[in-house]
Design a protein with these regions (language model features):
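Short, charged beta-turn/beta-strand-edge "cap" motif at the junction between a beta-strand
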Residues: 19-22
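Ferredoxin-like alpha/beta domains used as RNA- or RNAP-binding modules
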Residues: 1-10, 17, 27-110
Length: 110
């Protein structure tokens, strides 16, 4: 039984599940067929985007419309990529912490 191909979008936050970059977060720069090109604004820029199989990625629901618009226009700067990535990671962390009581967390660590 074949795995369903993930429907990724430009500007979507993803995490690498396999390879030497396992655990690394990226933004989707381009989707073509069964390959995805990823950037992070640090080591991976559009000129040397990471090519990855979508099966090796954990997708997030978070998408940066600002990143997608700049990628479409072709004027992405490293600082823009880093800012978008930081914003999405911060938003993801906030969503994970919603509804948690800090006092309960402190008691759980005792």
């Amino acid at each position: 039984m074949a795995k369903a191909i993930k429907q990724l979008q430009v500007g979507q936050l993803v995490r690498s599940l396999a390879g030497h970059d396992k655990g690394q977060y990226y933004l989707v720069l381009k989707v073509a067929g069964v390959k995805v090109w990823l950037v992070d604004g640090y080591k991976r820029l559009p000129a040397n985007a990471k090519q990855k199989n979508p099966c090796h990625l954990q997708e997030s629901k978070l998408i940066s419309a600002d990143f997608a618009a700049k990628a479409q226009a072709g004027n992405l700067r490293p600082e823009d990529m880093r800012a978008c990535l930081r914003a999405l990671l911060s938003q993801q962390a906030d969503e994970l912490n919603v509804g948690k009581n800090p006092d309960e967390e402190a008691l759980a660590n005792v």
